[in-house]
Amino acid sequence: YQQASSEVRKPAPQPATLRVGVYYSPLFTFRTDLMDVTIERLKNAMPEYAFQVVPLSEFDLTVAAVKHEVDLFVVTSGLYTYLETSGATALAVRKSPQSQDPGKAMGAVFIARADDARITSTSDLRSKRVAALSPQSFAGWIVALGEISNITQYPKNFFGKAYFKDKSGMPIVEAVLNKEVDFGILRTCEFESLVARGLVAPNTIKVVGKKPEDTFACLRSTDLYPDLIFAAQASLSPDIKRRLSAALLSMPMSESGYGWTVGANLSETRHLVERLGYSPTVRMTGPSVMIDRYKYALLIGVLLLAAAVLYSFAVSRTVARRTKKLVEVIDEKSELEKTARIDRERLSQLE
């Protein structure tokens, strides 16, 4: 009886907390458009769990997912293909009102000052200064390099000096308008969002390399890739993943027109990631950027230097060999002259 009483008096176990990592920016409305209602949906579907939203920068979200500091995360398709190698599971793909196909819903757009006559096409971006989010950003950098790979075999060396702002949207537009850079790279639909909020006058900015209009509602300069993916760590049980996925896929569309749908084809994303050697956990700064950018020029310089050293060595050996022969000839001539002089002296004595 006493044992039974003690078991009854034991406190109820605290609910497990599932940490959800999401990208956060003051101008990125993902949380209000979809994430807040998504968390409420998950709480109602799985009341025994507490869901903690962890807002992070894009790079910090990447690190948190890799280090298993979050249990669930919403990431780009590019980052997901990197994480799935360690067992991450896609639960659902975001469905946005801007695209009829969630498999073609995210890309990049090149912007420049409207009065900059130097830049009228994507090829004009060669050697131009650029502002972008970060070298780890899939939609804000890698997708743009994928478009440039249609022009050159070395897309990473195509642009001029790159200025990474660590924040997308307005900081990039301001850098372009203030002539700190020649052009900027935004993620698709960011430009329209800034214009709609009155933060950017549409007649001050032009889109470079605009793709033809199709089922995608926003301006773009690149191909499109799958939308954001809601994923889970490999450490979560299959039952939890199944319940999470069911709750997401059965959720009605939000008031803003966003929702979740079944997974998209990631083959094009994987191809792009492999082709460009996408390493989202490597933060490139300072010398690393310079070395990566000018590695071919450095290689050519090293080869030229090595060739110069070898040529100098060969010339030195040739000069030394010929000098030795010349000295031998001079010595031989001196010896002959000495012998001739002695002979003349003897002949003079005989006379």
Regions found by a protein language model. Give the residues of each.
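Extended ligand-binding regions for polar small-molecule ligands
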Residues: D36-A45, R113-D116, P202-Y278
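Immediate post-signal peptide segment of exported/extracytoplasmic ligand-binding proteins
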Residues: Y1-V22, S123-R129, S279-M290
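Bilobed "Venus flytrap"/periplasmic-binding protein-like clamshell domains
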Residues: P15, R19-K43, G103-E174, C189
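Extracytoplasmic small-molecule ligand-binding "clamshell" domains
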Residues: V8-Y82, S86
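Short, charged amphipathic alpha-helical "coupling" segments at sensory-output junctions
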Residues: K325-E351
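Pocket-lining segment of extracytoplasmic ligand-binding domains
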Residues: R129-A131, P135-L236
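Acidic, polar ligand-binding/catalytic clefts
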Residues: V63-D124, P135, L145
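N-terminal membrane insertion elements
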Residues: C218-R220, I240-S334
